[in-house]
Design a protein with these regions (language model features):
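Secreted, disulfide-rich extracellular signaling modules
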Residues: 2-15, 20-451
Length: 451
């Protein structure tokens, strides 16, 4: 079998690297090996890039398996991205079947919601008002929901006004013993009417969750700030110890309680984004830009085309990195920091976006590994003038090699997307210099070997 030159090069590349590392005298990369075939080891950062800001498609946001670390809830009023909202829809289930409410009278009802510090974004010194609504439309326990879906709501059943979220303040009002676990959470008072509604549900309808859900179709959790920029709060509804609705009632002169839990229930987040009049909104659909805009949740992604990649004939891609520089805009809010992680995705079929091979190589098939070998997180560097700048460096070595080897004219194979990760629980955004910026344009840094 005849081995191609490129295959031979890839096979011998580890040996080349070991040989170079063992030399005491510096030599050119690969000197002495394949010397008749390898012409040079080159660098360029001038490849043409076409960038287009696009609005995200809907995201699968159901958590039927109760594995989500948190859910976003709140409103952001961003000077460059407009207004973004996140509402939570959820079922509640009985903590145990067939509670005994015979001759019970209501004392009170409280909804406890645990905070997750990792997901908070914005200004937590701005007072928040959180509202709880009963659903008129059934939230199905056996269906998937997407981030653009809403369900019809009815009566407001609870409200906590003008509170300051304190996601770092840990306490435990349920267990005051010295060794008790502590967490940051809030207690939302629930109306007497809704508490009595729960008490009055027929005992037969509380023998199984599926029967109970026909009576309580679900709830919606929404929050609004007192003023800009507001904040996205992160609620860990799957913590059974600190997230539940507790019904306090009296029976036989004793005050008792019964819990309704989120854990084990279907729940999802709805995102809405109003870009009217915003800089980001005006950039949507444009592809010749000074500034680029990315946003998590159901926000914005970046489409990047490298149309002439296939014109690099007979090359081995040693390293390909997309370099993006964050832009500090006048009038921005310092609390709205750049996103912690960007990733590359590509189209599978016509509509589905999947992580690229370079991303998957770094984090592994379970998506639990480190991004160190891929990049995509903000780092501080010096520009040519010695000034500190913040950049993202994103590896696309394997993906770009596929572009180089591709046939001319297949623009789909030369197209990548940049998304904030993980999208449905990432409320942050990023403003980046675009391809037309005179000092810090987006660019592809390419190291390659000619054959």
């Amino acid at each position: 079998m005849r081995m191609s030159l490129k295959s031979l090069y890839i096979l011998l590349l580890p040996a080349v690297m070991l040989a170079v590392a063992a030399c005491t005298k510096p030599t050119a990369f690969g000197e002495g090996l394949l010397s008749s075939e390898i012409a040079d080891y080159a660098f360029t950062d001038t490849l043409t890039l076409r960038c287009t800001v696009e609005q995200e498609d809907s995201l699968l946001s159901s958590d039927r398996s109760s594995t989500a670390s948190y859910f976003l809830c709140g409103q952001l009023q961003d000077p460059f991205f407009g207004v973004s909202n996140a509402d939570i829809y959820s079922l509640l289930q009985l903590s145990n079947a067939s509670p005994n409410f015979t001759d019970a009278t209501l004392d009170s009802a409280v909804l406890y919601l645990r905070f997750s510090l990792a997901g908070f974004y914005g200004d937590t010194t701005v007072p928040q008002t959180i509202r709880i609504f009963q659903l008129d439309e059934q939230l199905r326990w056996d269906s998937d929901y997407y981030s653009n879906q809403r369900l019809t709501t009815g009566t407001e059943i609870g409200k906590l006004e003008n509170f300051l979220p304190k996601p770092s303040t840990l306490y435990n009002a349920f267990d005051t013993s010295a060794n008790a676990a502590k967490a940051a959470y809030i207690a939302v008072p629930i109306t007497q009417d809704f508490g009595n509604f729960l008490l009055d549900i027929d005992s037969i309808d509380m023998t199984a969750d599926s029967l109970f859900w026909k009576k309580l179709r679900g709830i919606r959790i929404s929050a609004t700030p007192a003023n800009a920029p507001g904040a996205m709060m992160a609620l860990n509804l799957n913590d059974i110890n600190f997230s539940f609705l507790r019904l306090y009632y009296k029976r036989d002169t004793l005050v008792r309680f019964f819990d309704y839990e989120f854990l084990g229930c279907n729940k999802f987040t709805n995102f809405t984004h109003d870009y009217s009049g915003s800089d980001a909104g005006q950039a949507i659909g444009q592809n010749t830009l000074d500034y680029l805009y990315l946003q998590g949740m159901g926000g914005l992604r970046l489409k990047v085309e490298i149309p002439y990649a296939d014109q690099l004939d007979d090359v081995i891609v040693n390293k390909a990195e997309l370099v993006l520089t964050t832009a500090a805009r006048s009038g921005d809010n310092a609390l709205l920091k750049p996103a912690n992680q960007l990733v590359f995705t590509e189209l599978r079929g016509d509509t589905s976006l999947v992580l690229t091979s370079d991303v998957l190589y770094a984090i592994g098939p379970t998506l639990s590994g480190s991004f160190v070998n891929f990049g995509g997180f903000p780092i501080t560097e010096k520009d040519t003038g010695g000034n500190n700048i913040q950049r993202y460096r994103m590896t696309l070595t394997q993906r770009f090699q596929n572009m180089v080897d591709d046939t001319p004219g297949n623009i789909k194979n030369k197209t990548l997307y940049i998304n904030i990760y993980p999208q449905r629980i990432a409320p942050a955004r990023a403003i980046l210099f675009g391809p037309q910026h005179p000092d810090h344009p987006i660019k592809l840094e390419l190291k390659y070997t000619r054959l």
